[in-house]
Amino acid sequence: MKHALLVFTKVPKAGEVKTRLTEDRGGILTPEEANGFYESCVLDVIDTCLTVEGVDVWVCYNKDGNRADLDGLLQGVKGSEKIVGVFPDAGGSFDDCMQYATDYILKNGAEDRLADAVTILGGDLPSLQRKTIEEAISKLDRLSKLSATGAALVQGACQEGGFSLVGLTTSTPFDFHKVFYNMDGITALDMLVNKVVEENIPFGTVEMMPDVDIPVDLASILPLLRALEAAQKNDPSVTVPRRTMEKFKEIGLETFAFPPHRDEIG
């Protein structure tokens, strides 16, 4: 089975990415700092994807994004020549954009499809591990053999009932309609699972990967990245997002936990 990895991202631009991390939206970063963080994170994610063997790596960016700026940014990726293709989404809701990107690669199973399975990742996953991607691909291969049609779907959850990774085969009866935007108050992950159960799709999960959208996410991810850095000294299979960590140091971000009040102990 031919696999594609698709990094789904906005073109980084100050004031347009990670705005909920900025002071104007109640956050702690300037627009330039938030943009610098996102740039670093996207490059780290793509770097990690490019270390996975036997897959094609694609990048899908927002329709209104500046392609020249993105091309310039991608020159900073080690092995950028390995990126098979870069294309814009078609606009619309996030559901629409995800569906367009999926169809662009899988082409509804047509002979001119670009892959037999696609795994989509966000650009804001600082703790992304190569072994997590490899596990998702392996599970897609295994699960697809459980169905006469080759259908299979794998997801990796993130905070607040969302997911940060989703992979599916070209014959999987799944679409993103109402997954991220619905009027019923159903979380994205719940909606995904509802569709999987309804269609009886062979289904698997990989480890949770937090994204970074709001200040509390920063407070959570910083200790995790330090833990990854320490773990890599004894386990070279651990992926450390060097650019993102350097950016955090440049900004001067540190975590702090208030000690509990005495009457809250015991």
Question: What are the residue ranges of the model-derived segments?
Answer:
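Short, glycine-/small-residue-rich phosphate/pyrophosphate-handling segment
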Residues: 173-192
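Conserved alpha/beta core of the MobA/IspD/sugar-nucleotide pyrophosphorylase nucleotidyltransferase superfamily
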Residues: 187-266
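Short phosphate-binding loop-to-helix
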Residues: 69-116
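Short beta-strand/loop segment that forms part of the nucleotide-sugar
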Residues: 54-63
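Short aromatic-hydrophobic micro-motifs that form the base-stacking/packing surface
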Residues: 117-121
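Conserved donor-nucleotide/metal-binding helix-loop-beta segment in metal-dependent transferases, i.e.
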Residues: 125-160
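A short, N-terminal amphipathic alpha-helix
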Residues: 36-55
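N-terminal nucleotide-binding beta1-loop-alpha1 segment
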Residues: 1-23
